[in-house]
């Protein structure tokens, strides 16, 4: 009887011990609180470390399991084998769920390696190159297109329809990519880009060509952003900067190759091949992505929702507001002072609409919170708004010099548009090579902030030297100055995306990347307009000062190549001096922007890409 009673008492004790252990394990599986986890400030959105209380709870749980096992054995139960060290759940696993390990920065569920990784990177690079090529390839083909369609009045829309939709849809895709699997969204946008290219190539009229360009722009915005996000998912974090640098370099190459390739197609085949060339390349990229990329399941997509709830998650009100706001602003920048006077009612209406829609969009984003296209907490992250400021300044400066250095060569050195592009190669090559080197350096060292400081320091020296160009400047001067500028800008151009992808939780990377790409494209359009306004005003002023009593209006209105035909030979030296001075005065704006980029680096946190990735929803 005593033996039986002792056995029942031991069984009760073992049951209580197991129930107590399960209770403690349930406590560990609950979301972390202030007593278990210390979080960084909201602007960092990054977990720091687990406290000693977590270690104590984990040890208690393990001890409880041992006690329960011992009690069961005492009661005559079968012994429970001790778990292997590798099988024991960590605190991070207990907090996030046993099937949701925190990414250690070296691998992920979709990691690709070896020749498969090389194939994916080549496919993505080709797609991005085609997308960026479409921005410049028509510059030499437009005369042939307008002659075929008899559509000189539509000439500006062949370029604008593409650029407008790319800029407008960048933020929209940031939201879509954050909610759905990157692989399938990317393939959809690639299909849109290819469909738009097909429409352009087969266009029977000018209107069809414009529509095709708009469709291609809608897809192109998603292709660029999606390429960055696929790389973020399939590669270790410390290798991502190298590919992002490659993409930035491809943009520089496309700006030079585009006009040359467009001229070759137009002269020897047909202008339609400017678009048909995208079809086989896009098909190859799609085949590679389908075959080798495994999409990561996003945490936000794991919760089953009704179709109405899914629609609300897309922030339809924000999308309805931001698309026309961006389009109105870009039309103002394109038409103001060029096609229409600033006092024209069309420009005034567009300005009012752009401002009103932008203010309403901001209010909606604050009201929507986590459902917003741009959640306010992401913008409050100091690394994000620092990267935004840096991008605006660096891309604005790059735009100024990219557009106006060729004009200086054409006007002052009397070379063709093609030749001026070749003479602009020192800056472009400097950007491409140093962009790659900085990406490699970040991958090796781990820290991107030092390279970002290098951009405004070296770049502003080269930009400042370019303001000293004059009519008699030789190749030694303009080649050296361009190289310095290219080295500076290239060393930091790709790194705002790296900073954002490192500083944000995984599920916020798409939104953060979209914000950066949007500000880059918008700053390019904005400062191109600023440069144009400075150039036109200073050119008229300089010509009037150099040639008093001479009608200088016709000189100010002609293309750079036609200056020598628009003025009498005896006035040509003064005219060239005035023209050169006006362009170098534009370079002052580019120099100021490059210098101001330094202040964008200051708030960016000096994190390492070799550290752990921030787990999804670490900001909660």
From Swiss-Prot:
Species of the source: Emericella nidulans (strain FGSC A4 / ATCC 38163 / CBS 112.46 / NRRL 194 / M139) (Aspergillus nidulans)
Compositional bias ranges of the Basic residues kind: 16-27
Family annotation (InterPro entries): MFS, MFS_dom, MFS_trans_sf
Protein's name according to its UniProt entry: MFS-type transporter ausY
Function: MFS-type transporter; part of the gene cluster B that mediates the biosynthesis of austinol and dehydroaustinol, two fungal meroterpenoids.
GO biological process: transmembrane transport
Residue ranges, compositional bias (Basic and acidic residues): 49-58
Chief subcellular location: membrane
Gene Ontology cellular-component terms listed: plasma membrane
Segments for region (Disordered): 1-107
One MF annotation (Gene Ontology) recorded for this entry: transmembrane transporter activity
Family statement drawn from the similarity comment of this UniProt entry: Belongs to the major facilitator superfamily. TCR/Tet family.
Alphabetically ordered keywords of this record: Membrane, Transmembrane, Transmembrane helix, Transport
Parts of the chain that traverse the membrane: 117-137, 157-179, 191-211, 215-235, 242-262, 273-293, 317-337, 347-367, 388-408, 422-442, 445-465, 478-498, 515-535, 581-601
Polar residues biased stretches: 30-39, 59-72
Membrane topology, from the record: Multi-pass membrane protein
Entry's localization field: Membrane
Note: In A.calidoustus, the austinoid gene cluster lies on a contiguous DNA region, while clusters from E.nidulans and P.brasilianum are split in their respective genomes. Genetic rearrangements provoked variability among the clusters and E.nidulans produces the least number of austionoid derivatives with the end products austinol and dehydroaustinol, while P.brasilianum can produce until acetoxydehydroaustin, and A.calidoustus produces the highest number of identified derivatives.
């Amino acid at each position: 009887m005593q033996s039986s009673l002792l056995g029942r008492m031991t069984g009760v004790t073992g049951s209580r011990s197991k129930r107590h252990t399960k209770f403690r394990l349930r406590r560990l599986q609950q979301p972390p609180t202030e007593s278990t986890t210390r979080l960084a400030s909201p602007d960092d959105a990054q977990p720091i470390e687990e406290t000693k209380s977590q270690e104590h709870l984990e040890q208690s749980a393990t001890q409880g399991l041992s006690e329960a096992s011992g009690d069961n054995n005492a009661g005559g139960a079968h012994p429970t084998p001790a778990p292997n060290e590798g099988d024991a759940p960590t605190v991070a696993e207990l907090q996030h769920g046993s099937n949701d390990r925190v990414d250690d920065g070296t691998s992920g569920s979709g990691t690709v390696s070896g020749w498969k990784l090389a194939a994916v990177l080549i496919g993505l690079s080709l797609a991005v190159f085609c997308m960026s090529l479409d921005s410049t390839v028509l510059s030499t083909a437009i005369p042939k297109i307008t002659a075929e369609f008899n559509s000189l009045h539509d000439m500006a829309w062949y370029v604008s329809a593409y650029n407008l939709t790319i800029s407008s849809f960048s933020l929209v895709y940031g939201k879509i990519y954050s909610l759905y699997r990157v692989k399938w969204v990317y393939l959809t946008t690639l299909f849109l880009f290819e469909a738009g290219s097909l429409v352009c190539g087969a266009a029977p009229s000018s209107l069809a060509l414009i529509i095709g360009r708009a469709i291609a722009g809608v897809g192109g915005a998603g292709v660029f952003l999606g390429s960055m996000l696929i790389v973020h998912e399939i590669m270790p974090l410390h290798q991502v900067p190298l590919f992002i640098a490659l993409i930035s370099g491809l943009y520089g190459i496309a700006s030079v190759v585009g006009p040359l390739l467009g001229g070759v197609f137009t002269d020897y085949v047909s202008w339609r091949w400017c678009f048909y060339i995208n079809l086989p390349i896009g098909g190859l990229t799609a085949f590679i992505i389908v075959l080798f990329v495994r999409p990561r399941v996003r945490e936000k997509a794991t919760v089953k929702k009704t179709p109405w709830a899914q629609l609300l998650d897309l922030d339809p009100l924000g999308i309805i507001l931001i698309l026309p706001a961006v389009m109105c602003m870009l039309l103002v920048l394109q038409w103001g002072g060029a096609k229409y006077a600033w006092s024209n009612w069309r420009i005034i209406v567009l300005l009012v609409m752009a401002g009103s829609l932008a203010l309403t969009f901001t209010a909606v984003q604050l009201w929507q919170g986590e459902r917003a296209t741009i959640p306010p907490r992401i913008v409050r992250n100091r690394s994000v708004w620092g990267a935004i400021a840096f991008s605006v300044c660096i891309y604005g400066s790059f735009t100024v010099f990219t557009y106006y250095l060729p004009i200086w060569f054409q006007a002052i050195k009397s070379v063709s548009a093609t030749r001026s592009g070749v003479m602009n190669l020192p800056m472009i090559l400097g950007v491409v090579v140093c962009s790659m080197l900085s990406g490699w350096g970040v991958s090796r060292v781990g820290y991107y902030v030092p390279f970002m400081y290098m951009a405004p320091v070296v770049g502003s020296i080269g930009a400042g030297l370019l303001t000293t160009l004059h009519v008699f400047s030789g190749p030694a001067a303009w080649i050296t100055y361009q190289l310095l500028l290219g080295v500076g800008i290239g060393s930091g151009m790709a790194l705002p995306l790296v900073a954002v992808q490192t500083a944000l939780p995984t599920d916020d990377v798409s939104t953060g990347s979209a914000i950066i790409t949007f500000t880059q494209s918008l700053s390019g359009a904005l400062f191109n307009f600023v440069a144009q306004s400075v150039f036109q005003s200073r050119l008229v002023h300089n010509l009037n000062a150099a040639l008093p009593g001479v009608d200088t209006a016709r000189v100010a209105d002609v293309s750079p190549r036609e200056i020598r035909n628009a003025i009498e030979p005896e006035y040509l030296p003064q005219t060239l001096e005035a023209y050169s001075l006006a362009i170098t005065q534009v370079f002052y704006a580019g120099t100021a922007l490059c210098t101001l980029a330094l202040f964008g680096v200051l708030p960016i946190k000096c994190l390492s890409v070799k550290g752990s990735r921030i787990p999804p929803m670490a900001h909660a």
